[in-house]
């Protein structure tokens, strides 16, 4: 029997799951349980414990009994590992306690992840549970990139630094880009653009990140679906003092009512493009601001790296929106960046080159697979403890 890993991504109102074989990369099953704790859902899912049972029931209804899956571990995506949790970590009670201490750094993401881990450990007590952290890949950012220019004593006391996020995706995609090009990862200088509802950019030299757009939290950097990205901190003070908004109100606005949705009232880029075509000025502005910020980061990372071999687009928007890719890189031929219009328009779902032959900088589209990366991280940290079926 092939060994497999159950990968869980627990949010406040949803649990995404996937069962994968880390050795072969085969996806055995996947799905999502949504509207946890919400009234009026098609199937009442009162809490995360009920959601876990729905996961098991869904697997069984698809013909995948737990006993027949060859499960050897459960992998959990955790957004923030702070400074000390930066490797795939076998979860024990001490790990849970430390994650709870870190929750103020990721108040929207870590608490539901912790809850998911606790529920899964009770449901599957005989399997090792492994936490894999979004921040891990960026743990060793150069000090100049990781440090905020604020009072050093305050920063040190409260562990304030640029942690970076989407690290599992950035690492996986950079490795896949090297494999696609059949070039050693250590020899490549790369820019990776992870463009989904959450969005981030990274500059990677020889397989190690030297810059990334997200910071202490996933709010910094690029314009995102509902998050503002970079914003003058003075805006927060102004709204607090002048508009009478509380810190909680401002945080909710910057996280949930900003970005493309805040400007254009929409996070689905397919709808956004339709509205732009019909002359919607708000949709056009939202798109223009989104593209402008992306181009700003691409330019900054060209300067940071000095020379670039590969630019790679990934995640939902990056993989599927040819117009975004075109507009981010248009007019940059002086820097060696060109797109082949036909290749860029290709709807293929596999890794592919979208720059013309001979272009100084290769541009790729590489599908991300964070679930497989987490499954393989579990296999890596557990090693011989897993055995083979």
UniProtKB/Swiss-Prot annotation:
Keywords associated with the record: ATP-binding, Cytoplasm, Kinase, Magnesium, Metal-binding, Nucleotide-binding, Transferase
Pfam families linked to this entry: Acetate_kinase
Positions contributing to ATP binding: 16, 194-198, 268-270, 316-320
Cofactor: Mg(2+); Mn(2+)
Subunit annotation: Homodimer.
Protein name: Acetate kinase
Family: Belongs to the acetokinase family.
GO molecular function, a single term: acetate kinase activity
Record-linked PROSITE patterns: ACETATE_KINASE_1, ACETATE_KINASE_2
Binding site for substrate: 77
BP term (GO), one: acetyl-CoA biosynthetic process
One term under GO cellular component: cytoplasm
Active site: 134
Cell membrane recorded as keyword: no
UniProt site positions, description: Transition state stabilizer: 166, 227
Gene3D superfamilies: 3.30.420.40
Pathway entry: Metabolic intermediate biosynthesis; acetyl-CoA biosynthesis; acetyl-CoA from acetate: step 1/2
InterPro entries reported in the protein's UniProt record: Ac/propionate_kinase, Aliphatic_acid_kin_short-chain, Aliphatic_acid_kinase_CS, ATPase_NBD
Subcellular location: Cytoplasm
């Amino acid at each position: 029997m092939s060994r497999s890993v159950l990968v869980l991504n627990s949010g406040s109102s949803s649990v995404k799951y996937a069962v994968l074989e880390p050795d072969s990369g085969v996806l055995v099953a996947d799905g999502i349980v949504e509207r946890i704790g919400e009234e009026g859902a098609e199937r009442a899912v009162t809490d995360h414990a009920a959601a876990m049972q729905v996961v098991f029931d869904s697997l069984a209804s698809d013909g995948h009994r737990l006993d027949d899956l060859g499960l050897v571990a459960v992998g959990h995506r955790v957004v923030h590992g702070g400074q000390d949790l930066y490797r795939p970590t076998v979860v024990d009670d001490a790990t849970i306690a430390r994650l709870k201490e870190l929750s103020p750094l990721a108040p929207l993401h870590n608490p539901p992840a912790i809850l998911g881990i606790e529920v899964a450990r009770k449901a599957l007590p005989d399997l090792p549970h492994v936490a894999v952290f979004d921040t891990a890949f960026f743990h060793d950012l150069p000090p100049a990139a990781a440090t905020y220019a604020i009072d050093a004593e305050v920063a040190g006391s409260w562990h304030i630094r640029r942690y970076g996020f989407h690290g599992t995706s950035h690492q996986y995609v950079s490795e896949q880009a090297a494999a696609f090009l059949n070039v050693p990862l250590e020899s490549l200088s790369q820019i990776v653009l992870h463009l989904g509802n959450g969005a981030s950019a990274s500059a990677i030299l020889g397989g190690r990140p030297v810059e990334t757009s997200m910071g202490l939290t996933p709010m910094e950097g690029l314009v995102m679906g509902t998050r503002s990205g970079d914003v003058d901190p003075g805006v927060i003070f102004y709204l607090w003092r002048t508009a009478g908004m509380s810190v909680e109100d401002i945080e909710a606005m910057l996280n949930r009512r900003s970005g493309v949705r805040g400007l254009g009232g929409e996070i689905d880029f397919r709808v956004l493009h339709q509205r732009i075509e019909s002359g919607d000025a708000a949709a056009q502005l939202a798109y223009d601001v989104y593209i402008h910020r992306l181009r700003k980061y691409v330019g900054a990372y060209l300067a940071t790296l000095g020379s670039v071999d590969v630019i790679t687009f990934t995640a939902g928007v990056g993989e599927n929106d040819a117009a975004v890719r075109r507009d981010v890189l248009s007019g940059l031929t002086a820097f060696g960046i060109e797109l082949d219009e036909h290749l860029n328009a290709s709807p293929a779902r596999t890794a592919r080159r979208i720059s013309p032959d001979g272009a100084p900088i290769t541009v790729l589209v590489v599908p991300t697979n964070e679930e497989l990366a987490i499954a393989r991280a579990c296999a890596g940290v557990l090693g011989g403890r897993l055995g083979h079926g």
